[in-house]
């Protein structure tokens, strides 16, 4: 239950951050070197991410891992 909830929360944070930067899912997925479909599942909270992918995401956003996780409970 907790992991499902945190995956959804993380996905919501990613979506808001991506939209704030004016990027489409396709553009952001390319920056992270993953498919748009896979990225979409992450945004919807349907898939957990590895630490390696979290690092790619934070690099693509130009933020630290700490900043990426700052709004999670």
Tell what function each PLM region has.
Residues 19, 30, 59:
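Alpha-helical residues within the helix-turn-helix
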Residues 37-40, 47, 66:
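Key DNA-contact positions within bacterial/archaeal DNA-binding proteins
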Residues 67-73:
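Short amphipathic recognition helices of helix-turn-helix/homeodomain-type DNA-binding modules
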């Amino acid at each position: 239950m907790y992991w499902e909830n945190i995956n959804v929360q993380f996905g919501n944070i990613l979506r808001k951050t991506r939209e704030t930067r004016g990027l489409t899912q396709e553009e952001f997925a390319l920056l992270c070197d993953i498919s748009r479909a896979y990225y979409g599942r992450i945004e919807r909270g349907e898939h957990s991410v590895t630490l390696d992918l979290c690092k790619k995401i934070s690099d693509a956003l130009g933020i630290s891992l700490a900043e990426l996780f700052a709004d999670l409970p």
